[in-house]
Amino acid sequence: IDVTIVGHLGSAAYIGAIAVGGMLFNIIYWIFGFLRMGTSGMTSQAYGRHDLNEVTRLLLRSVGVGLFIAFTLLALQYPIERIAFTFIQTTEEVEHLASLYFYICIWGAPAVLGLYSFAGWYIGMQNSRFPMYIAITQNIVNIAVSLLLVYGLGMKIEGVAIGTLTAQYAGLCLLYTSPSPRDYAASR
């Protein structure tokens, strides 16, 4: 979404910046994919045993670990960005734009890692629809907010970064409408 929007801004530097920024977040978040995968497996086992107390504990543990990691990433954002750019060779303009994108999008880490935990938990609870609804909502919000900020307000790279950040938290807010462990207990 971000590349598509900045691709019309008239400079290849914007596309390069989104590519570099996206790559950094793909690496960072891929490392913590265990929050989703590990949570889904253990939750599925506990749910199959009808152990709803363990199901709830698994969700709380996973979210707690995810938030700890997210706040650590926020605290270490400057060294992470500096170290990353010692390995990534770009032009000064692309590095500057990618840094702007990084420093805005890193604030989405609590939402992203929290959603990893919830997605794994929902999949383990045999509910893959809700994570899909969250992903669809995030994409719609990202497109709408990014278009508004970039083309409506002329914010360029900052606009797509804020659009991405807004979409991440919109997905997290959607959790307030989601089934809780008590809802699953009532259905059994």
Question: PLM features: residue spans?
Answer:
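Hydrophobic/aromatic residues within transmembrane alpha-helices of membrane transport systems
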Residues: 2-6, 18, 43-48, 55, ...
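Small-residue-rich hydrophobic transmembrane alpha-helices
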Residues: 15-75, 112-131
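Membrane-embedded alpha-helical segments of multi-pass transporters/permeases
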Residues: 74-82, 143, 147, 172-176
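Single conserved hydrophobic/aromatic residue that forms the stacking wall/gate
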Residues: 176-187
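Short membrane-interface helical motifs at transmembrane helix boundaries
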Residues: 72-103
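Membrane-interface helix-loop junctions in multi-pass transport and translocation proteins
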Residues: 139-172
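Residue-level recognition of transmembrane alpha-helices
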Residues: 19-22, 66, 105, 109, ...
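Interfacial/gating helices of multi-pass transporter permease domains
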Residues: 6-26, 93-97, 157-158
